[in-house]
Amino acid sequence: MTGRRLARFPAFRAGVAQDDDVGSTLSQGSTTGVLSGPNWSYWPSRVLGSADPTTIAHRHGTHRITSPDETWLALQPFLAPAGITGVADVTWLDCLGIPTVQAVRPASLTLSVSQGKAASYRAAQVSAVMESLEGWHAENVTADLWSATARDLEADLTYDPAQLRHRPGSLYHAGVKLDWMVATTLLTGRRTWVPWTAVLVNVATRDCWEPPMFEMDTTGLASGNCYDEATLHALYEVMERHSVAAAVAGETMFEVPTDDVAGSDSAHLVEMIRDAGDDVDLARIDVWDGYYCFAAELTSATLEVTFGGFGLHHDPNVALSRAITEAAQSRITAISGAREDLPSAIYHRFGRVHTYAKARKTSLRLNRARPTPWRVPDVDSLPELVASAATAVANRSGTEPLAVVCDFADACVPVVKVLAPGLVLSSASPMRTPLQEAE
């Protein structure tokens, strides 16, 4: 099957095209779609709390339709049904003081402990619980259509499934029978289909062999107070992973100097790290117009291990905060030993801590980034933000991105999986050389 390629999308506001020459429709072969945004009517309506699901009303460290306090209250009835037995503050397992929280779900079919980080403790609590709920939903999603081939669904598919991320040795072809989930395109709101195994995240052992097909990972899996909020977070993660894959020192990746960070809302996070005797190197990855992506690398004077984090957002302050707090969270994750998927190499290096040798900083020499414009105009419309990000992804990949609601009988919060067929993604640090990673 030949994938349908999209022409470049016009920028549009609140679902209406602004380019008069293009109009308000897109043509893909025999398919015409109206620029209307995602269509959530295929799934039950879900909104946490009573906030307006179309408007950003909270802008302190993150952009949400409601505050972390209100989200925290709305989440309480769902903890027990999801199997979350505890929420623990692990901030001071490390010396940095950046709020980090764990949510424990012992019966998980993936990771039993999820971590959340933020610039405030309440936001970190919400982050941890929401990540755990994301996992619970992705573990239990059910298919909507059974045993059909891509050829059977060709009239309804808006993309080529061969463009999805495949497992090594994948046996996928257009004639193989798969189970499918309903999806919506994010710009035109058309119904399409996504392979169930491209959404499912479940590592439970089964008593039968299954041919390798699609990559099982959580890239693009996100929750929120409403579907649009979750979708925006998922799109930003997909765009972040593409930025990491496309980062080239001196071309798209540049050093962020200390004097530039001083003008950001995250200056205090850098001060906390340095007050603890550690250091953080920052880079800006300029891949997406109108979006800011940062990479952070945390080093310690007494620990031969580096830890990294990334963040992408339309507000550079939020992007930088996410990168720094993710780096701090990754170190606490290793210290606590809480994740089942931690590589043993981390602890081999931890075993050398008695040497008190400082981790080698990146050997890459980056040019200084131009000053970051830390004050950018606020955008209140959540649908507009989703449309802008989806347009950017579609223009880069040539294919309209998709969203699947992770739905099942006990689903309780808005959780979506966003897929961007044809977009190259990576989570490997572009600030480390292969030699350094092997050491």
Swiss-Prot record:
Organism for this UniProt entry: Mycobacterium tuberculosis (strain CDC 1551 / Oshkosh)
Domain of life: Bacteria
Protein name stated in the entry: Uncharacterized protein MT1419
PROSITE patterns: YCAO (PS51664)
Pfam families with a match to the protein in the record: YcaO (PF02624)
Domain YcaO: 116-439
